[in-house]
Amino acid sequence: MSDSVITQLKASPVRRGFALLVMMLLGFLLLYLTMTTDASFFHKVFLVAVAAAVLWMARAMQRGTTGYIELRTTGLFFENGRTLALIDDITRVERGVFAFKPSNGFVVSLKQKTNRAWIPGMYWKFGARIGIGGVTAPSDAKFMSDTLAVLIAEREGSSLMGMKL
């Protein structure tokens, strides 16, 4: 089987811009609150620390959402070649309403635990689960999750008739 790219999942420019705007606005509002309120030194230090963390996450999201996730015949990969999950390690794809998943995304369950990783707005890896989505376009994420479910069904040799995707 060749390692050809089936589909790519990129950040939606509108969703990315809105998410960055909200995070940066929150960070600057916290800094403004620190400057204008009459609070104790420890409260101000706490507000500055939270503002710095929010602005750092906004910068991490800005850098991370310039990339894309690829679904290849061998698995899920980030644009720089980082392996998210191999097809042989994936047990199922969850996209339901009550699934613990990113906004407009899906969750991939793995056979074994993986290293933790997180790119805000694109994906997170924790334990034996990978959440993909956030600032991505819902239609692209749905297509990728459906295609991944078909690849898993083909690997297991099961019929897709009656399968709930």
Q: Where in the sequence are the language-model features?
A:
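Acidic, Ser/Thr-rich low-complexity segments on the non-lumenal side of membrane proteins
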Residues: T83-N115
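Short edge beta-strand segments in beta-sheet-rich domains
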Residues: T66, S103, K125-G127
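A membrane-cytosol interface segment of integral membrane proteins
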Residues: Q112-L165
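N-terminal membrane-targeting/pre-transmembrane regions
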Residues: M1-D38, R129, S159, M163-L165
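Conserved beta-hairpin
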Residues: V50-E94
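Hydrophobic alpha-helical transmembrane segments of multipass integral membrane proteins
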Residues: M23-F28, V48-L55
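Hydrophobic alpha-helical transmembrane segments
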Residues: T37-V50
